[in-house]
From Swiss-Prot:
The lineage of its organism: Eukaryota, Metazoa, Chordata, Craniata, Vertebrata. It comes from Homo sapiens (Human). It is an enzyme of class 1 (oxidoreductase). This is Aldo-keto reductase family 1 member B1. Catalyzes the NADPH-dependent reduction of a wide variety of carbonyl-containing compounds to their corresponding alcohols. Displays enzymatic activity towards endogenous metabolites such as aromatic and aliphatic aldehydes, ketones, monosacharides, bile acids and xenobiotics substrates. Key enzyme in the polyol pathway, catalyzes reduction of glucose to sorbitol during hyperglycemia. Reduces steroids and their derivatives and prostaglandins. Displays low enzymatic activity toward all-trans-retinal, 9-cis-retinal, and 13-cis-retinal. The modification N6-acetyllysine is found at residues 95, 222, 263.
Length: 316
């Protein structure tokens, strides 16, 4: 198992990263420090997580202690939906760089294809509770992302939560300068994403799987929701390999040539989640896990279903 995947800009992206969505600011500094000590070299961030400053403190400390060099780290962040206007993209990226205390990002993603009205609110809502869209389009936003590469602020650019038609739109953009390096999507045994993954990989786009454990700490979880970590069928596969369910759920995307970014702020779990390079799921295990697909999404962005660029009305 290669520990890094080659991106279309020539960079090598660590196949396993630490996710920081929902990591409380008071805990994320310690989490990132532990992760780097344990061997993680890829940290997945975003402006909307409201903890990039604290992530940056941890990165700086580890650089200062010479535990790691900057060029060994792979730092990812994301452009939030309220910054899709061409004139706002660079400032949003600079804010992230300043919070993370870095000169450049290894990868910068458009977080969602849906542009929102600019302003202080991350989710600007109208009277009926729907998100207020911006009149931006994906291609203009992409052109502004390309400028960040030319200016040296980011090494690679990509997308997140884009369906295959939206990916195709970028690939067919007149005057396209840089292809998306990555599409980061939700992916786990209940949402296996075969068609979208096959499409992206056929175009030389690496896929990152987020919420590989089903995001059990999501604020909107309902008691009747299915639980990957408690699924007896997945527990059985884990027992067979003498591994935890989480380790199986992290290894599963890796064997599909996906990058995977499990989130934890618990030192023991951060270390446990990294111990996935010393075993292999059989092809039977892989087929079995793929068969559990039920097209169940943790992140459906339901406040945006009427947005013109809402990604999940399409089959893939």
């Amino acid at each position: 198992m290669a520990s890094r995947l080659l991106l279309n800009n020539g960079a090598k992206m660590p196949i396993l990263g630490l996710g920081t969505w929902k990591s409380p600011p008071g805990q994320v500094t310690e989490a990132v420090k532990v992760a780097i000590d344990v061997g993680y070299r890829h940290i997945d961030c975003a402006h909307v997580y409201q903890n990039e400053n604290e992530v940056g403190v941890a990165i700086q400390e580890k650089l200062r202690e010479q535990v790691v060099k900057r060029e060994e780290l792979f730092i990812v962040s994301k452009l939030w939906c309220t910054y899709h206007e061409k004139g706002l993209v660079k400032g949003a990226c600079q804010k992230t760089l300043s919070d993370l205390k870095l000169d450049y990002l290894d990868l910068y993603l458009i977080h969602w294809p849906t542009g929102f009205k600019p302003g202080k609110e991350f989710f600007p809502l109208d009277e009926s509770g729907n998100v207020v869209p911006s009149d931006t389009n994906i291609l203009d936003t992409w052109a502004a992302m390309e400028e960040l590469v030319d200016e040296g602020l980011v090494k690679a650019i990509g997308i997140s939560n884009f369906n295959h038609l939206q990916v195709e739109m970028i690939l067919n953009k007149p005057g396209l300068k840089y292809k998306p390096a990555v599409n980061q999507i939700e992916c786990h045994p209940y949402l296996t994403q075969e068609k979208l993954i096959q499409y992206c990989q056929s175009k030389g786009i690496v896929v990152t799987a987020y919420s590989p454990l089903g995001s059990p700490d999501r604020p909107w979880a309902k008691p009747e929701d299915p639980s990957l970590l408690e699924d007896p069928r997945i527990k059985a596969i884990a027992a067979k390999h003498n591994k935890t369910t989480a380790q199986v759920l992290i290894r599963f995307p890796m064997q599909r040539n996906l990058v995977v970014i499990p989130k934890s702020v618990t030192p023991e779990r951060i270390a446990e989640n990294f111990k996935v390079f010393d075993f292999e799921l059989s092809s039977q295990d892989m087929t079995t896990l793929l068969s559990y697909n039920r097209n169940w999404r943790v992140c459906a962005l339901l406040s945006c279903t009427s947005h013109k660029d809402y990604p999940f009305h399409e089959e893939f």
